[in-house]
């Protein structure tokens, strides 16, 4: 609706940007480097970050970088994940029909992973997104999941990704056996003010607009509200563009952004 008004070639601030068009901050680049190292060393790793900070986007980038002849990426995201469902999902992604009973499915998955590594020369990369929602039962199962050949061999990398509370959960004594196995930890921070300004400029440019549409004052209000969280920035920018187009305004100032935030986002 606002695209023709501003002259956009496509809608800006979308989540489904091609990997080649994604904006990256130094924090994102560090995360990608750490994830690649995790995969190379077959680590068990923990990635945390606030909602909308770009964790899942980083996983998309990682997936696009890995050679499919060397790695098999297995992505799991289920708020009600149980061990049986987990094994079933991983096995299906490995083109195996999962056994009905949990113990059988677990042994089946172990065999499938070893076959992938030893016979096909590919390393499994298991990505568990929204891991802060994992149940106690599922978290405890991870310890057994990582136990290959009496804990002397690790044929895969396992990456847990979730909100900051995941780190706090794993600090509980009952999960000490799990935390001792974590080979890499990283917390993805939000963008700072300059990074957010560059982020907005990047998304406008990718959508076909080279000129700035948001005043400095508008960006200051936006940063104050969003804290540099990409998803919040996207939402407010889209709503502000729509509001500006409806009012026949070519420039988005601090007054409009503040009004949009107050009326649409309740702050």
How would you describe each model-predicted region?
Residues 1-41, 258:
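A short, basic N-terminal segment
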Residues 11-13, 70-73, 81-100:
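Conserved NTP-binding/hydrolysis module of P-loop NTPases
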Residues 41-64:
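Walker A/P-loop nucleotide-binding motif
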Residues 45-48, 75, 127:
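Short hydrophobic/aromatic beta-strand immediately N-terminal to the Walker A/P-loop
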Residues 60, 155, 177, 194-267:
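C-terminal alpha-helical "lid" subdomain
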Residues 63-66, 166-181:
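Short regulatory helix/loop adjacent to the ATP-binding pocket of P-loop NTPases
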Residues 82-85, 97-141, 150-154, 191-196, ...:
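Mid-core helix/loop region of P-loop NTP-binding domains shared across ATPases and GTPases
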């Amino acid at each position: 609706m606002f695209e023709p008004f501003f002259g956009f070639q496509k809608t800006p601030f979308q989540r489904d940007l091609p990997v080649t068009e994604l904006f990256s901050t130094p924090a994102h680049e560090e995360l990608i480097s750490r994830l690649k190292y995790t995969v190379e060393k077959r680590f068990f790793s923990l990635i945390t970050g606030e909602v909308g900070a770009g964790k899942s986007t980083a996983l998309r980038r990682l997936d696009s970088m890995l050679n499919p002849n060397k790695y098999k990426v297995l992505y799991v995201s289920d708020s009600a994940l149980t061990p049986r469902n987990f094994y079933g999902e991983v096995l299906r992604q490995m083109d195996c029909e999962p056994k009905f009973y949990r113990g059988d499915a677990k042994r089946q998955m172990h065999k499938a992973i070893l076959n992938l590594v030893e016979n096909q020369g590919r390393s499994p990369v298991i990505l568990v997104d929204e891991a802060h929602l994992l149940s106690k039962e599922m978290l405890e199962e991870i310890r057994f999941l990582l136990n290959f050949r009496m804990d002397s061999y690790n044929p895969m990398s396992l990456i847990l990704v979730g909100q900051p509370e995941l780190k706090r959960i794993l600090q509980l004594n009952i999960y000490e056996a799990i935390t001792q196995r974590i080979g890499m930890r990283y917390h993805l921070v939000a963008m700072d003010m300059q990074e957010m300004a560059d982020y907005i400029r990047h998304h406008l440019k990718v959508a076909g607009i080279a000129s700035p549409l948001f005043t400095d004052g508008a960006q200051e209000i936006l940063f104050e509200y969003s804290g540099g969280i990409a998803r919040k920035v996207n939402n407010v920018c889209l709503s502000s563009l729509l509001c500006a187009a409806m009012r026949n305004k070519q420039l988005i100032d601090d007054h409009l952004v503040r009004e949009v935030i107050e009326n649409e986002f309740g702050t």
